[in-house]
Amino acid sequence: GHNPAILMKKDGSHELLETGGPVLGVFDSFEFEQGKFALGDSLLFCYTDGVVDATNNAEEPFEMERLVDFLKTQLDSAPSRICSGLRRELRNHIKDMPQLDDMTFLVLKK
């Protein structure tokens, strides 16, 4: 599953980009809603549900709030540093638990 992309603004606020449709490639034909936004000096974070669903041995998922809090600390970082930092945060969270779902994410910045 693909959760709504997160547009992280320079002031630390964020917006979920929910316009669209189902995951790409599942249906032969489907009309997607089209939306627009200006990236400006914001950060765009696209990800699969495996990121927020990553669970530790106490059965606590990583969750959206923890993801947004992490992204707030990375607003001035390069996309590659954000990705490596998030991989580290996820590993620290799940520790020795097996990865149960894919964790795919993409960071875009100007």
Pin down the residues of each PLM region.
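Conserved subregion of the PPM/PP2C metallophosphatase catalytic domain
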Residues: 1-110
